[in-house]
Swiss-Prot record:
It comes from Mycobacterium bovis (strain ATCC BAA-935 / AF2122/97). InterPro entries: Ade_phspho_trans, PRibTrfase_dom, PRTase-like, UPRTase/APRTase. It catalyses: AMP + diphosphate = 5-phospho-alpha-D-ribose 1-diphosphate + adenine. GO terms for molecular function: adenine binding; adenine phosphoribosyltransferase activity; AMP binding. HAMAP family: Aden_phosphoribosyltr. It is an enzyme of class 2 (transferase). This is Adenine phosphoribosyltransferase.
Amino acid sequence: MCHGGTWAGDYVLNVIATGLSLKARGKRRRQRWVDDGRVLALGESRRSSAISVADVVASLTRDVADFPVPGVEFKDLTPLFADRRGLAAVTEALADRASGADLVAGVDARGFLVAAAVATRLEVGVLAVRKGGKLPRPVLSEEYYREYGAATLEILAEGIEVAGRRVVIIDDVLATGGTIGATRRLLERGGANVAGAAVVVELAGLSGRAALAPLPVHSLSRL
């Protein structure tokens, strides 16, 4: 796998840089050049060649063996989020898949990074779905199991109205589906309409998508 410091990663990012520009909207804002998961170079049509967002993700993702426990290969997206062009491409692509939501739910902790960026792009609010014990009470709690142990997620039971709102769950990685499944149950207990989930990376071999069916799931890269 190529990383940000390699020539391949630099090539991908240099092409992406030509595909992001600014246009007037009162104050200047980013012009959108992401179409159906492809990053278009400036001036190119939708029919011309483009760099896949999946290639961007792959070029800036680091594999870490035996983390956080032995036997687990961790997908570290920190280099992707730290790169302004990589983050911009991922934000645009996820925002496209979350279109129509009036609230975005970001999952603790790396999901916060992309969820906040997507919410800003869509001009909607972001709800922090926290790990157990991180929020002041009263809270709604949901226990679940993931590939390396049990965990708890929580949202505020007061102060934020989620009932009747169309929510899309945003996270960095989809593995077994345990985290997103628990988030969905938590939101639905609060009365939300969970429209789908969007993630940066899907670990296809762990069958998380099947575990979440029939919830619509969108991923930018399947590894």
